[in-house]
Every structure is written in C-alpha cells, then in structure tokens.
Swiss-Prot record:
The gene is adkA. This is Adenylate kinase. It comes from Thermococcus kodakarensis (strain ATCC BAA-918 / JCM 12380 / KOD1) (Pyrococcus kodakaraensis (strain KOD1)). ATP binds at residues 9-17. Its EC number is 2.7.4.3. GO terms for cellular component: cytoplasm.
Length: 196
C-alpha cells in the first residue's frame, strides 16, 4: 500500500531545508520527492517551459494535466518505498491561487500525513529578499499571510479527500531551524511506527 507524507509551505518558509535536514536525522527511510521538480521535468519534456519559475505562469488546465501525470508517477514510487512529498499546497498565479492538488490529484496521492511549515510573514519576506537565486514574485506581508491562510484551508480540504492527519510546524527565526527539524523528525518517526 503506498505511503505518502506531504510537506508543504509557501516559498521562503524553509520547507525544503527543513525536509532535507530531517531526513538525515529520522529513523524513517523515506524517499524525498519534489512535486515541482517532477512537474518541471514533464513540462520541459513537453516543451512548455525552460525555467522552473515559469511553471506558475502556465494556464490552469495545463498545470492540472501535469499534476495528474506526476501524481501517478509518485504513487508508483510509493508502492516501492514511503515517499516524503515536498510541494506547495497553493500556487500564486497571475489569475489567482491554484490548488497544488485538485481533488483528483489528492485522491490519487491519498497521503497519510500533511505537514505545513509556516513562519511569520516578515520572516518569509526577509528570506525571499535574501534569496537571489530564485525569480520570486514580490508580495507584501499581508499577501504572504493570506497565502499561508489559504495553505491551511487547502490542507483541510486535502485531508477531507484522503483522511490524512495535519501537522503545522513553525519555522521562526528566534525558534530556530533545529527545533522545526526535530518536530518534523517526530512526525516522520510516528508515521513509520504507526503505519509500517
């Protein structure tokens, strides 16, 4: 039976860093899969984009088709080994916010856990401004807060279609990265002990 833990958070929250560090500390033997990387691979192969940050500018129907293809690939991987799926619950597009997982995609993935990484909007804004490697859209602290609220709402909707448990982990500058990593390790170890 496929076993999937979804980890999500808006750009700049530290999700990918926390995930990579937690996998080094956990007893769990998850395979880290990045949903966006697989979508980007598919989109490049189809000649739709050349750079990852162009993904959010694709029309919603094209994005959904890519999501469905990628979800099937992830389930195939998860049949062989547990998957820690690094993704975004919602994606800000020029037309509005797109769910990272439409109903059909979440039903295919059927995750066991959904972990949301959050931080204060001011911290996220600061991290984005310091990250010169990415071509990120500029958002105000208010827009960042709204995006995080939408992520929580999306996680609840995902849980309704998958019976996943939801865990929120805060990654504040004063709290420390290590504490957020340790919280994720506890979730991953719990997942393995409960469902292995």
């Amino acid at each position: 039976m496929p076993f999937v833990v979804v980890i999500t958070g808006i750009p700049g929250v530290g999700k990918s860093t926390i995930t990579k560090l937690a996998l080094k500390k956990t007893r769990a033997k998850f395979r880290l899969v990045n949903f966006g990387d697989l979508m980007f691979e598919e989109a490049v192969n189809m000649g739709l984009v050349k750079h990852r940050d162009e993904m959010r500018k694709l029309d919603p129907l094209t994005q959904k088709e890519l999501q469905l293809k990628v979800a099937q690939r992830i389930v195939e991987i998860a049949r062989k080994e547990p998957v820690l799926l690094d993704t975004h619950a919602t994606i800000r597009t020029p037309a509005g916010y797109l769910l990272g997982f439409p109903r059909e995609v979440i039903e295919i993935l059927n995750p066991n856990f959904i972990v949301i990484i959050e931080a204060a909007p001011s911290e996220i804004l600061g991290r984005r401004l310091r990250d010169l490697k990415r071509d990120r859209d500029v958002e105000t602290e208010e827009q960042i807060a709204r995006h995080q609220d939408l992520n929580r709402a999306a996680a609840i909707a995902y849980a309704m279609h998958s019976n996943a448990l939801i865990k929120i982990i805060e990654n504040h500058e004063d709290k420390g990265l290590e504490e957020a990593v340790n919280e994720l390790v506890k979730v991953l170890d719990l997942a393995v002990s409960e469902y292995a």
